[in-house]
From Swiss-Prot:
Residues 85-105 are annotated as: Disordered. GO terms for biological process: symbiont entry into host cell; symbiont-mediated arrest of host cell cycle during G2/M transition; viral penetration into host nucleus. Stimulates gene expression driven by the HIV-2 LTR. Prevents infected cells from undergoing mitosis and proliferating, by inducing arrest or delay in the G2 phase of the cell cycle. Cell cycle arrest creates a favorable environment for maximizing viral expression and production. Disulfide bonds: none annotated. The keyword Plastid does not apply. It comes from Human immunodeficiency virus type 2 subtype A (isolate Ghana-1). The lineage of its organism: Viruses, Riboviria, Pararnavirae, Artverviricota, Revtraviricetes. The keyword Transcription regulation applies. Interacts with human UNG. This is Protein Vpr.
Amino acid sequence: MTEAPTEFPPEDGTPRRELGGDWVIRILGEIKEEALKHFDPRLLIALGNYIHSRHGDTPEGARELIRILQRALFVHLRAGCNRSRISQTRRRTPFPAAPTPRGMY
């Protein structure tokens, strides 16, 4: 993957800022808090350990964890979580565009 472009310091001489560092930490905290309401904490710990073993304690690891948790929460809520306002009313498949395989009615 390509690296993020280097940010040049502002003309007024203020120090450089980290690209999205504070935002990533804040969003990760919010998503982890929401994920704990819907998923088993042991699963989230295992996922965090897996991401940490692949990326270490880096912003890339935090971003990957955010992406995975966002997708998991979306699918979970779309499939019909009782706590969700966006869940579907009919309880068939969370992906209505995917046809049911033959013989599996």
